[in-house]
């Protein structure tokens, strides 16, 4: 049976780049992998076909020969470039699944074949509590973070001074071993050296063979103005160190904003509850309110009711990605006086009597409410 065109097998154009070819291979290899399709001969054949196409098109020399001469250019029986056979499934997935699943398939998150596996260090998380004012204006601070550093006794080798790590006898320094089971040959992380390619016969007593010890380091952290609760700041390279020369992880500083005694934040806007005397609500006047930038005042019209909201533009918080500050919403609460003197009581009674003489025009909300109640019972 004639072989299908390699580009057709992978579903890519003839001018496809290396990244596009690799992406297509990943997708198809995962789809037809025998582990996902047990006892499925068609899937097995598709998998072999996809693997062969990728082996040819991912190699610059073979691809050039194939583009010029077709299958004859890469068929060893035709004197061309020659295929290298299929080998085990581990070869097909050593790079692909290693990129997708990290250590789960082949042991290494990064790194090439034939040597100790290289691992990126783990990320660290640090929770930090700040005030609303600090979140609004931003500030620089220092944090103390527990972290791993190279052991000073063994200089990071993990071996007792005077000794040194030795090549792992199980994997012979490769960091991986092949496990054969029937039709499959699977590459796994070496169980003795855990992918390092070496083992330590006499561990350092200070670091117990890890080559690193824990200590607290001080880091500078810049809190940007406008940061919100739950946001994270990334400090690149300040996570745990990598293994076998792998890159370090990152530190993520998670921000939590303390509850404020006056303001509640809603995005870039602020809200506050403002009690005002009933006389100010009735007669109107100027009231003063706090803001994060100081004090501000605004007029309250006469006849203001409790629960009325006033909007002060630009008195909120300037967001991280905005040059315009949010607004401050002031919710006024009309305060009823308490602990009245006899004279004050008499004055209020006279005032109440004068309101009754004026009819419903002094209390429009009360009239509206009583009218609704009356219609409800009718």
From Swiss-Prot:
Disulfide bonds: none annotated. Its cofactor is Zn(2+). Binds 2 Zn(2+) ions per monomer. A zinc finger (CR-type) spans 138-216. NCBIfam families: DnaJ_bact, PRK10767.1. GO terms for molecular function: ATP binding; heat shock protein binding; unfolded protein binding; zinc ion binding. Its main location: cytoplasm. One of its GO terms (biological process) is response to heat. The gene is dnaJ. Homodimer. Zn(2+) 1 binds at residues 151, 154, 204, 207. Zn(2+) 2 binds at residues 168, 171, 190, 193. This is Chaperone protein DnaJ. Participates actively in the response to hyperosmotic and heat shock by preventing the aggregation of stress-denatured proteins and by disaggregating proteins, also in an autonomous, DnaK-independent fashion. Unfolded proteins bind initially to DnaJ; upon interaction with the DnaJ-bound protein, DnaK hydrolyzes its bound ATP, resulting in the formation of a stable complex. GrpE releases ADP from DnaK; ATP binding to DnaK triggers the release of the substrate protein, thus completing the reaction cycle.
